[in-house]
Protein backbone atom coordinates (compact mmCIF):
# COMPACT_ATOMS: atom_id res chain seq x y z
CA UNK A 1 0.00 0.00 0.00
CA UNK A 2 1.31 3.46 -0.87
CA UNK A 3 1.54 5.69 2.18
CA UNK A 4 2.37 8.89 0.38
CA UNK A 5 1.79 10.56 -2.90
CA UNK A 6 4.40 11.31 -5.53
CA UNK A 7 6.13 14.66 -5.50
CA UNK A 8 5.55 16.09 -8.96
CA UNK A 9 6.98 19.60 -8.95
CA UNK A 10 8.26 20.94 -12.24
CA UNK A 11 11.90 19.95 -12.78
CA UNK A 12 11.84 17.55 -9.82
CA UNK A 13 12.06 13.76 -9.88
CA UNK A 14 9.12 11.66 -8.73
CA UNK A 15 9.83 10.54 -5.15
CA UNK A 16 7.38 8.04 -3.66
CA UNK A 17 7.21 6.91 -0.03
CA UNK A 18 6.10 3.31 0.28
CA UNK A 19 5.67 1.25 3.48
CA UNK A 20 7.06 4.20 5.41
CA UNK A 21 10.29 4.34 3.39
CA UNK A 22 11.18 7.50 1.51
CA UNK A 23 14.16 7.53 -0.88
CA UNK A 24 17.30 9.09 0.61
CA UNK A 25 19.09 11.33 -1.89
CA UNK A 26 22.50 12.63 -0.82
CA UNK A 27 22.72 16.41 -1.38
CA UNK A 28 25.77 15.92 -3.65
CA UNK A 29 23.96 13.41 -5.88
CA UNK A 30 21.82 14.33 -8.89
CA UNK A 31 18.48 12.92 -10.08
CA UNK A 32 16.97 13.86 -13.46
CA UNK A 33 13.56 15.53 -13.36
CA UNK A 34 11.69 12.61 -14.94
CA UNK A 35 13.36 9.84 -12.92
CA UNK A 36 11.29 7.91 -10.37
CA UNK A 37 12.58 6.77 -6.98
CA UNK A 38 10.31 4.54 -4.90
CA UNK A 39 10.78 3.27 -1.34
CA UNK A 40 14.07 2.12 0.21
CA UNK A 41 16.41 3.84 -2.26
CA UNK A 42 19.68 5.38 -1.04
CA UNK A 43 21.97 7.47 -3.24
CA UNK A 44 25.52 8.20 -2.06
CA UNK A 45 27.46 11.40 -2.78
CA UNK A 46 28.02 12.20 -6.47
CA UNK A 47 25.74 9.40 -7.66
CA UNK A 48 23.68 10.37 -10.70
CA UNK A 49 20.33 9.01 -11.84
CA UNK A 50 19.54 10.08 -15.39
CA UNK A 51 16.39 10.59 -17.47
CA UNK A 52 13.53 8.06 -17.45
CA UNK A 53 15.17 5.85 -14.80
CA UNK A 54 13.07 3.89 -12.31
CA UNK A 55 14.52 2.74 -8.97
CA UNK A 56 11.79 0.69 -7.27
CA UNK A 57 12.50 -0.68 -3.79
CA UNK A 58 9.36 -1.76 -2.01
CA UNK A 59 10.64 -5.09 -0.61
CA UNK A 60 14.40 -4.63 -0.09
CA UNK A 61 16.80 -1.67 -0.36
CA UNK A 62 18.52 -0.27 -3.42
CA UNK A 63 21.91 1.26 -2.55
CA UNK A 64 23.74 3.27 -5.20
CA UNK A 65 27.40 4.02 -4.44
CA UNK A 66 29.41 7.22 -4.63
CA UNK A 67 30.15 8.51 -8.12
CA UNK A 68 28.00 5.86 -9.80
CA UNK A 69 25.87 6.78 -12.81
CA UNK A 70 22.57 5.12 -13.66
CA UNK A 71 21.96 6.14 -17.27
CA UNK A 72 18.80 6.93 -19.21
CA UNK A 73 16.02 4.35 -19.22
CA UNK A 74 17.53 1.98 -16.66
CA UNK A 75 15.22 -0.07 -14.42
CA UNK A 76 16.43 -1.17 -10.98
CA UNK A 77 14.10 -3.39 -8.94
CA UNK A 78 14.24 -5.73 -5.96
CA UNK A 79 12.52 -8.91 -4.83
CA UNK A 80 12.06 -10.20 -1.28
CA UNK A 81 15.52 -11.34 -0.08
CA UNK A 82 17.15 -9.80 -3.16
CA UNK A 83 18.29 -6.21 -2.57
CA UNK A 84 20.27 -4.26 -5.16
CA UNK A 85 23.69 -3.01 -4.19
CA UNK A 86 25.67 -0.97 -6.70
CA UNK A 87 29.18 0.00 -5.61
CA UNK A 88 31.19 3.17 -6.14
CA UNK A 89 32.31 4.41 -9.55
CA UNK A 90 29.97 2.11 -11.49
CA UNK A 91 28.43 2.88 -14.88
CA UNK A 92 25.04 1.33 -15.67
CA UNK A 93 24.40 1.91 -19.39
CA UNK A 94 21.20 3.06 -21.06
CA UNK A 95 18.18 0.74 -20.78
CA UNK A 96 19.92 -1.87 -18.64
CA UNK A 97 17.95 -3.81 -16.02
CA UNK A 98 19.34 -4.59 -12.57
CA UNK A 99 17.09 -6.95 -10.62
CA UNK A 100 17.99 -8.09 -7.10
CA UNK A 101 21.73 -8.15 -7.81
CA UNK A 102 25.09 -6.79 -6.66
CA UNK A 103 27.40 -4.72 -8.86
CA UNK A 104 30.80 -4.16 -7.28
CA UNK A 105 32.99 -1.03 -7.45
CA UNK A 106 34.23 0.19 -10.82
CA UNK A 107 32.15 -2.19 -12.96
CA UNK A 108 30.48 -1.19 -16.22
CA UNK A 109 27.11 -2.64 -17.20
CA UNK A 110 26.58 -2.17 -20.94
CA UNK A 111 23.52 -0.74 -22.64
CA UNK A 112 20.54 -3.08 -22.55
CA UNK A 113 22.28 -5.65 -20.35
CA UNK A 114 20.21 -7.56 -17.77
CA UNK A 115 21.53 -8.75 -14.39
CA UNK A 116 19.12 -10.98 -12.45
CA UNK A 117 18.41 -11.91 -8.80
CA UNK A 118 21.37 -13.00 -6.71
CA UNK A 119 23.93 -12.36 -9.45
CA UNK A 120 27.16 -10.59 -8.52
CA UNK A 121 29.27 -8.65 -11.01
CA UNK A 122 32.83 -8.41 -9.67
CA UNK A 123 34.79 -5.21 -9.20
CA UNK A 124 36.16 -3.64 -12.36
CA UNK A 125 34.25 -6.00 -14.67
CA UNK A 126 32.51 -5.11 -17.92
CA UNK A 127 29.18 -6.68 -18.90
CA UNK A 128 28.78 -6.16 -22.65
CA UNK A 129 25.77 -4.44 -24.19
CA UNK A 130 22.79 -6.78 -24.41
CA UNK A 131 24.32 -9.48 -22.21
CA UNK A 132 22.23 -11.47 -19.73
CA UNK A 133 23.67 -12.44 -16.34
CA UNK A 134 21.38 -15.22 -15.08
CA UNK A 135 20.12 -15.60 -11.53
CA UNK A 136 22.81 -16.47 -8.99
CA UNK A 137 25.80 -16.20 -11.35
CA UNK A 138 28.96 -14.73 -9.82
CA UNK A 139 31.22 -12.88 -12.26
CA UNK A 140 34.84 -12.69 -11.05
CA UNK A 141 36.49 -9.26 -10.71
CA UNK A 142 38.03 -7.72 -13.85
CA UNK A 143 36.05 -9.96 -16.23
CA UNK A 144 34.62 -9.21 -19.66
CA UNK A 145 31.22 -10.90 -19.94
CA UNK A 146 29.22 -11.11 -23.17
CA UNK A 147 26.37 -13.13 -24.62
CA UNK A 148 23.01 -14.62 -23.69
CA UNK A 149 23.54 -16.18 -21.29
CA UNK A 150 26.59 -14.14 -20.37
CA UNK A 151 29.92 -15.94 -20.28
CA UNK A 152 33.29 -14.71 -19.12
CA UNK A 153 35.31 -14.10 -22.29
CA UNK A 154 38.58 -12.93 -20.73
CA UNK A 155 40.21 -10.91 -17.96
CA UNK A 156 40.31 -7.14 -18.45
CA UNK A 157 43.62 -5.29 -18.70
CA UNK A 158 44.59 -2.55 -16.25
CA UNK A 159 43.81 -0.01 -19.00
CA UNK A 160 40.31 -1.42 -19.51
CA UNK A 161 39.56 -1.37 -15.78
CA UNK A 162 40.77 2.26 -15.66
CA UNK A 163 38.57 3.10 -18.67
CA UNK A 164 35.53 1.92 -16.67
CA UNK A 165 36.49 4.31 -13.84
CA UNK A 166 37.12 7.12 -16.33
CA UNK A 167 33.65 6.62 -17.82
CA UNK A 168 32.07 7.08 -14.40
CA UNK A 169 34.13 10.26 -13.90
CA UNK A 170 32.85 11.67 -17.22
CA UNK A 171 29.29 11.31 -15.95
CA UNK A 172 30.18 13.11 -12.73
CA UNK A 173 31.27 16.08 -14.86
CA UNK A 174 28.15 15.89 -17.08
CA UNK A 175 25.96 16.38 -14.01
CA UNK A 176 27.02 20.03 -13.75
CA UNK A 177 25.94 20.74 -17.33
CA UNK A 178 22.49 19.30 -16.63
CA UNK A 179 22.11 21.02 -13.24
CA UNK A 180 22.73 24.36 -14.95
CA UNK A 181 20.32 23.59 -17.80
CA UNK A 182 17.48 22.74 -15.45
Regions found by a protein language model. Give the residues of each.
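N-terminal segments that cap or nucleate solenoid repeat domains
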Residues: 11-49
Amino acid sequence: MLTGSPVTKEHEPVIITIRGHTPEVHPESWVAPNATLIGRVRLAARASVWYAVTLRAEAEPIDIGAGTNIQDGVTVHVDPEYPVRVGAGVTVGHNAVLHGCTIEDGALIGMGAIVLNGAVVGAGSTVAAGALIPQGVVVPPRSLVAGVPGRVRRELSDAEVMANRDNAAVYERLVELHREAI
